[in-house]
Amino acid sequence: MSEKAIAVKAQHVEDVVEKFNNATSAIVVDYRGLTVEQVTDLRKQLREAGVQMNVIKNKILTRAAEKAGYGDLNDVFAGPTAVAFSNEDPIAPAKVLKKFADSVDALEIKGGYIEGNIVSIDEINVYATLPSREELLATLASQLQAPVRNVAYAIKAIVDKGDEGDAA
């Protein structure tokens, strides 16, 4: 192999290492059996969720995962492999891929990592059922507002009752 080819592959490995390091999560899938239309639809759904899916050679993935500290993932790099990287919402790839895999049997989730922790297929399925960060924050805000709102209604009722007593 020429030095130029080796340099190109080394650069490709470094690019993938950077993707691993910048991502809050990465989910590895086997896309064997998907049609071009299905892959295009999956990429669109992932893009809308802020996730980027890349098809990367297994040897490059193996080397990049080792360098990035995710060598435990090397067992899942076999066959046609794509990786969905998310730099923002760590749960987004799991949600989109799980939903898509439920509707299309050909997509197989193999494993990945979420916020630095290697996760199994079962763990990915659990994460996929969790509400998003925004949904959790909205629920928390609603729960925090409820007691204040109840006190405000109680004070208003007392004031209204006092006004009725003054009128009589």
Swiss-Prot record:
Q: Which PROSITE patterns match?
A: RIBOSOMAL_L10
The alphabetized list of GO BP terms reads: translation
Keyword check for Iron: no
Q: Which InterPro entries match?
A: Ribosomal_uL10 (IPR001790), Ribosomal_uL10-like_sf (IPR043141), Ribosomal_uL10_bac (IPR022973), Ribosomal_uL10_bac_type (IPR047865), Ribosomal_uL10_CS_bac (IPR002363)
The signal peptide, as residue positions, is: none
Under CDD domains, the record lists: Ribosomal_L10 (cd05797)
UniProt keywords (A-Z) are: Ribonucleoprotein, Ribosomal protein, RNA-binding, rRNA-binding
- Listed GO CC annotations: large ribosomal subunit
**One Pfam annotation, family name?**
Ribosomal_L10
Q: Which GO terms describe its molecular function?
A: large ribosomal subunit rRNA binding; structural constituent of ribosome
Task: Fill in the subunit field for this protein.
Answer: Part of the ribosomal stalk of the 50S ribosomal subunit. The N-terminus interacts with L11 and the large rRNA to form the base of the stalk. The C-terminus forms an elongated spine to which L12 dimers bind in a sequential fashion forming a multimeric L10(L12)X complex.
Protein family membership: Belongs to the universal ribosomal protein uL10 family.
Q: What is the role of this chain?
A: Forms part of the ribosomal stalk, playing a central role in the interaction of the ribosome with GTP-bound translation factors.
What name is this protein filed under?
Answer: Large ribosomal subunit protein uL10
